[in-house]
Amino acid sequence: VLSPTDKTNVKTAWSHVGAHAGEYGAEALERMFLSFPTTKTYFPHFDLSHGSAQVKAHGKKVGDALTQAVGHLDDLPGALSALSDLHAYKLRVDPVNFKLLSHCLLVTLALHNPQDFTPAVHASLDKFLSNVSTVLTSKYR
């Protein structure tokens, strides 16, 4: 559960992401594919090379979904229900991959916003991404 302080930290941090959400999403995906090569198995039809239009497009989807989640911190299950259905029933993504992408997102955010990435903000963003991952895997049962 996100505390009021966590919610403030997440909203403030995400306000600095702003228009870069898609770019950061794509960078985090690239970082994940390079650091955890087994994650590529879910994207056999993608060109996974650096700067790929497909990775950029998927990164935008990731960024947009997280922006939506930030706007609905009090109702993540409602805000992410359709995305949860997609990942559970159609894509069948192994839940561990959400943790890997979350880690890569944290690295990307820290790299681009070092002055704002305090230990408290890091902890709040980690809790937020963990909650998002939990919601996205909640329908796997």
Curated annotation (Swiss-Prot):
One of its GO terms (molecular function) is heme binding. GO terms for biological process: hydrogen peroxide catabolic process. It comes from Rhinoceros unicornis (Greater Indian rhinoceros). The modification N6-succinyllysine is found at residues 7, 11, 40. Red blood cells. This is Hemoglobin subunit alpha. Heterotetramer of two alpha chains and two beta chains. InterPro entries: Globin (IPR000971), Globin-like_sf (IPR009050), Globin/Proto (IPR012292), Hemoglobin_a-typ (IPR002338), Hemoglobin_oxygen_transport (IPR050056), Hemoglobin_pi (IPR002339). Keywords: Heme, Iron, Metal-binding, Oxygen transport, Phosphoprotein, Transport. Belongs to the globin family.
